C-alpha cells in the first residue's frame, strides 16, 4: 500500500509531530508499505492518507477527501487537538468529521471525543 503521512512540522524539524511521522514511516516501510512524509497533500499518489494534527492538517485533509471521497483517511489526534482545538476550532472539528479512523496516543483521549 502507498501511504502518505502529512505532518505540519517541516523537514529538519525536531517537533514531536515530525519525529512521530518519521518513526511511523519507518515502521510501515518495515512491513512492506511505500511511505512518503510531507507537510501537505498536493495530489501525491497514495492509497491512504495518515494526517497528524487535526487543525493544522485540515487543508490537506479537506483536499484529500474532496479529491478522493472513498479513499481511507486516518487522523492521528495530538495532545493539542484533544485538549483544545477539537473543542474550539471549526477546522479541527471538521477534520474529525472527514476522517475514517482515529489514532489516539493520549491516555484519556477517548474521553475528549463526543460519543
Q: Residues of each region from the PLM?
A:
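Short amphipathic alpha-helix
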Residues: 17-28
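Short N-terminal targeting/anchoring amphipathic segment
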Residues: 39-60
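A generic structural motif
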Residues: 31-38
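Active-site proximal beta-strand in glycosyltransferases
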Residues: 48-50, 64-83, 101-104
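A short, active-site helix/loop in glycosyltransferases that binds the activated sugar's phosphate group
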Residues: 100-115
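Nucleotide-activated donor-dependent transferases that construct or modify glycoconjugates
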Residues: 1-12
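A conserved, positively charged/aromatic
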Residues: 82-100
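Short, well-ordered alpha-helix to beta-strand connector turns
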Residues: 32, 46-47, 99-100
